[in-house]
Amino acid sequence: TYRWFPPNSPLELSNSEDITKLSTDEWSDYLGKHEFDDSKVWTKPFHKLLDSSRDVLLKELSYIADASSDEIGYLSICDPNYPYLLRQIKDPPLGLFYRGNIQRLDSPAIAIVGSRKASSDALLEAQNLANILVHEGGVVVSGGAIGCDTSAHFGAFDDFERSLTIAVMAGGVDRLLPRCNDALFRKVITQGGLVISERLRGTDPRPRDFPIRNRIISGLSSRTIIMQAAQRSGAIATANLALAQGRDVMVYLPRLGDIRFLGNESLRDAGAPSFSSAEAYFQMKWE
């Protein structure tokens, strides 16, 4: 990744693409260190950019205004119901599109994530752990992917078949992927669970959207549990985000020396508590 900063003179901006890549923090940092003697120097090209983007902006605003018209809601960061923990992270989403039961955001949440090509024991324990968590009064957060995410979502149904899970999407909430999980997503939405995304409806996920999305998974949760991860993986990235956000991280580690759990071992070696089964996790909780 890289961070692009404007040059010393705004007249050197080569194109509108550079401006649109800047985050709010980057603009704040830059403007805090530079003062322009003549504001017209930079306001003119900035307004030109806004004019050129008018149609896109109006379309996006209409999506937000009409969000509730087709069972898609929108929750602004200014809304008092916006999740408290998510609001505390460095770069919270300015708003969340959602489908399903928005009250799931009110419950204590724990994230369960892991490999898409997980071992059978990691899949089983992800489901067992999620099931015990929801019976303890919690909500399970994950990313809707195949593998550990799917097992966690499936495990987060209570005895009354209510879905107590939050699936955080990398694309719009009407572009739910992977397609093989369509039945799961429908069940989550119609049986009390929640699907959310910061992306506009009608937006397909791009590869870069998944790691950006992961900050929401960890940001919603007081703890992130890694079920199985390679040294370099989305699950490890989510764990690092959780640590940067000041949240707890724990790892499932049934045995040492299994190359499929090298990421888990690295986190354990760095100080993350580990457990060997869902039952062992809850024994640790009460010790």
Region roles according to the model:
Residues 1-80:
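Short, small/acidic-rich helices and loops at N termini and domain boundaries
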Residues 3-4, 72, 76-287:
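Glycine-biased, small-residue-rich flexible motifs in mid-sequence functional cores and linkers
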